């Protein structure tokens, strides 16, 4: 009888250790996923800042617009600058 109780308690202790190790691994995985999401958002913001604005895209200066476009002074959107080239 004592040995059965001892084995049952020992089994429960092993199960608790295994669950706690699994929980730690789960927490680490969650941290990695969150880090990856934050890095991806940071990269996306940087990419948006470098891209030019297309036709009728909002702008504040000519440098914001793509090639052959200029920033319209009244409406602040990119319009064609009247040039042709390849």
UniProtKB/Swiss-Prot annotation:
Disulfide topology: 52-66, 59-71, 65-78
GO cellular component, one term: extracellular region
Signal peptide stretch: 1-21
Subcellular location: Secreted
Transmembrane domains' residue ranges: none
GO MF assignments: ion channel inhibitor activity; toxin activity
Family assignment from sequence similarity: Belongs to the neurotoxin 10 (Hwtx-1) family. 17 (Hntx-9) subfamily.
Domain comment in the entry: The presence of a 'disulfide through disulfide knot' structurally defines this protein as a knottin.
Function field: Ion channel inhibitor.
Name the record gives this protein: Omega-theraphotoxin-Hhn1f 3
Source organism of the structure: Cyriopagopus hainanus (Chinese bird spider)
Lineage: Eukaryota, Metazoa, Ecdysozoa, Arthropoda, Chelicerata
